Amino acid sequence: MFCYSSLHAQIISGTVSAEGQVLPGAAVIIKGSTKGTSTDFDGYYTIEAQASDVLVFSYVGYANKEVTVGTNTQIDVALEADNTLDEVVVIGYGTQRKSDLTGSVSSVSAEDVNVNPVSRVDQALQGRAAGVQVTQTSGAPGAASVIRVRGGNSITGSNEPLWVIDGIVVGTNFNLNNINSNDIKSIEILKDASSIAIYGSRGANGVVLVTTKTGTGAGSSKPEVSANIYTSMQMVPELPKMLSQAEQIAYTNESAAFRGAAIPFPNDPSTYPNNDWFDLLLGPAPIYNADVSITGASENVSYYTSLNYFNQEGIVKTSGIEKYIFRSNLDIRLSDKLKTGFRVNYSYIDQQNGLVGYGNAIATLPTQPIYNEDGSYNGFDEVVGSPWSNPIANMALNTNETFRNNFLGSFYIDYSPSEKWIIRSTFSPDFDNSKQNRFTSSQSPNLLYLGEGGNASVRTVNTKGWNNENTIQYQSEIGENHRITALGGASFQKVSTEIVESEAFGITNDATGFNNLSNSDPTRNILTSDYSGFQIASFFGRLNYAYKDKYLLTLVGRTDGSSVFSDDNKYEFYPSIAAAWKISEEGFMQNQETFGELKLRASYGKSGNQAIDPYRTKGLLVEANTTLNGIQQTGLTLGRPSNPNLTWETTNSLDIALEASMFNGRVFAELNYYYKKTNDLLLDVTIPKQTGFNSQLQNVGSLENKGWEFSLNTTNVRTDNFNWKSTLMLSSNKNKILDLGGVDFIDLVVDELLGSGNTRLIVGESVPVFTGVKFLGTWKSQEEIDASGLRDPQVVGGAKYHDENGDGIISTDDAVVLGSPLPDLIFGFENTLSYKNLDFSFYFQGTQGNEVYNLRMRNHYFNRGEFTKFAEVADRWTPENPTSDIPRAGGDSVTGTPPNSAYVEDGSHIRLKTVRLAYNMPVDKMGMDGVKNATVYLTGTNLLLWSDFRLIDPEGSNFGRNGIGNIAQGYNDGSYPNPRTITLGLNVTF
């Protein structure tokens, strides 16, 4: 029998490929035996088999394929991606089968990124990944989103995740407008210690890995050309409801009468202007986008090249962004063992920063005239009695624009001495240059009134840096039961930034604008320059071990050295350990049909945050003047104390998760629980006044984050003509301050007008919390005031506040916790349906249980007559309406308006984020020769919003204000509205 089989054996050869590219290392095994081989660097294999044998072809991330040998001597196989747990995901410095992951990684596909038109990729992540909160704080063209991965770990430092684009660490200051979203192949978000420890001191806030598209069509000389063209119309969303012109006049007159001031509007309302500032300053605005890419490959070269043009006008007039982006990705196989290539991205951006704010539309009285009687622009506010910055004049006369050039590249070389070893070195330069030109005309009416002349400034920022990564990877199977992958590497990065700014005042001739700053008053001009830089050296390693494909272990360690710290604290080690148990591979699970995959995993580790400016360990010298012998002298003095003991903020994280694939892959669910504790928080601590300073930055305090995440992906219906899939993302995060360096609380100021007391860091509370006094409505009678025991002035109809400490005075000492901007629940829910050539999807996202601090309440609800009022103020307290709880006009002149509970509103909301209808043209039936596929689509974005918030959109926020962006979360003063958008587009491939 044996001799017969040998005589009829034959040599089979061929190549194994996937998605147009050869697959080195693919397994080729004779089914039912242990006999097999693997493909070489070119994807080529040879094996001896009989005609009756079945060859099984397999590769990580792709579905197995079986082929009967028969009479064939050459069998070429193309594998298809396996979209179950065996899909390949990108991790730090490599890839891994999803089924082998021991850490928490969320994947966002290119389809999810491009389902609705966005100018920045971060805008496309909202609601797409459990545990990742994305807040679109502004609808301005090109505006950044705020991203929190499993909560914020720092109080004063950055809480933004680390962005890594094609292996290039770009940091939190990188402008994501530089990247074309249509170039993106996939996005992975690393969330737990096991995943992020490989990035050490910069991984504590999570890591976002962006992988761009590469060449396809290996072995084919014919390139593939794709084009994606769309146009959008943005519409102004629902706006806050304000008093009518006549109602506003009545309110302003009441306020003046109560204060004993002159009545500003003594005549009939019809004799005064009735300007709709929303209509004057906001309006529909278009978006134009064109993407063209070419991709292909020859025997040894694969390439992807694209060009993108994007132009978005803003719904707030004079705002907008125009972008040109070029990308080229090239891979060259020099030999069986040597490969090289590059990833290059260049962008040019012209951003119009806007000459008027949305706040102008909310705040300006409808009675404020635009023009004087002689036709010139009005520049004086009669109600306030001071010069007024006329927004219509600003749009016509002034300039505020930013130009940016960015080059981001990565050049690599791979050497594979054998199938088990890969040695890689990359060099990644990053150059960014921006220039902001600002000009305010001398003819601006408020400046004409003051006689100050115009002003202009030119600000240039040049950032240059490089990153060198060197890794060596070894992977091997030891016997039938053991599989290991080991990675070691070293990373070096250097970044420097130079800023030069010139400001000129007293410009009398507008002809040259900001192009001739010498045309000004030299005694008032300001010249500034600044330089900063840092270097990081890192050494890291990772070991992945699998036993019988059931038990998985991952060990990670990284040592970072940073120039921002002193010599004694320059280096820190970040370790992690993770393990996973594939329960579904156990013998007792083999006879059940529910679970295809069932995995329990856990991880624990340490990551860091070097959340300080490069020179904060050192003292700061500032310019100071003194008088010697009657002559003023200028010198330098110490303006900030040094602290050589500053070190890294460190976060220790625990993650436990259960993953399950059920019912033949039709249901995939994942449940995570995590706990994070951050120590050595960087805070300004009060120090003895004998030092000459009030405070010093120190490592004190700690906080914790804990929460859960749940994701569910289901295939509800799957037939030849109809498919229906659903995705649900739920997550909840709670944080708490554990220690503030020995004090119970720290008061902070988020808004200068509100003064202190509107936010406070409190041990045992979240970061941040809103604080203020309790608003109790209005005083209904003098008897009620007299019985209250309050010693400070009160007035019938005025605002009534709770005296928390009972001292008879309403002050910040009466402040209590009023709420938190952190939601109890973050959710996203998507349904995708396809019938024959039609695709339809809709996507909801939102939050529940968060509060918003409405900064507009002070001016538009309480008693300042020079500002417009919310429509509900028409029902305010008056002698004829004595039961109202809305304060009377002018009452603030007696009681003041401290930060109070009326400012805090429910921020829970549901947003219909995206609706998309697409038709995939049957190009073959339509006789469209040369066209591979064509899709026409219609998309709606931000179509509906359910919210009780007065300013309509609760996502608007003051992140970044006063340099305390983490604390300003949830503070909303009516930021730039998120528009409703309708998009019509065509995607075609030749």
From Swiss-Prot:
Membrane topology: Multi-pass membrane protein
Domain TBDR beta-barrel: 220-990
UniProt-annotated stretches for the region Disordered: 878-902
Gene3D superfamilies associated with the record: Carboxypeptidase-like, regulatory domain, TonB-dependent receptor, beta-barrel domain, TonB-dependent receptor, plug domain
One Pfam family from the record: TonB_dep_Rec_b-barrel
Keyword list, A-Z: Cell outer membrane, Membrane, Receptor, TonB box, Transmembrane, Transmembrane beta strand, Transport
Keyword field contains Cell division: no
Short sequence motif TonB C-terminal box: positions: 974-990
Subcellular location: Cell outer membrane
Expression triggers: By ulvan and rhamnose.
Recorded superkingdom: Bacteria
Domain TBDR plug positions: 97-213
GO cellular component, one term: cell outer membrane
Short sequence motif TonB box: positions: 86-93
Cited function: TonB-dependent receptor probably involved in ulvan degradation. Ulvan is the main polysaccharide component of the Ulvales (green seaweed) cell wall. It is composed of disaccharide building blocks comprising 3-sulfated rhamnose (Rha3S) linked to D-glucuronic acid (GlcA), L-iduronic acid (IduA), or D-xylose (Xyl). The TonB-dependent receptor may mediate transport of ulvan oligosaccharides from the surface of the outer membrane to the periplasm for subsequent degradation.
Family statement: Belongs to the TonB-dependent receptor family.
Name the UniProt record assigns to this protein: TonB-dependent receptor P26
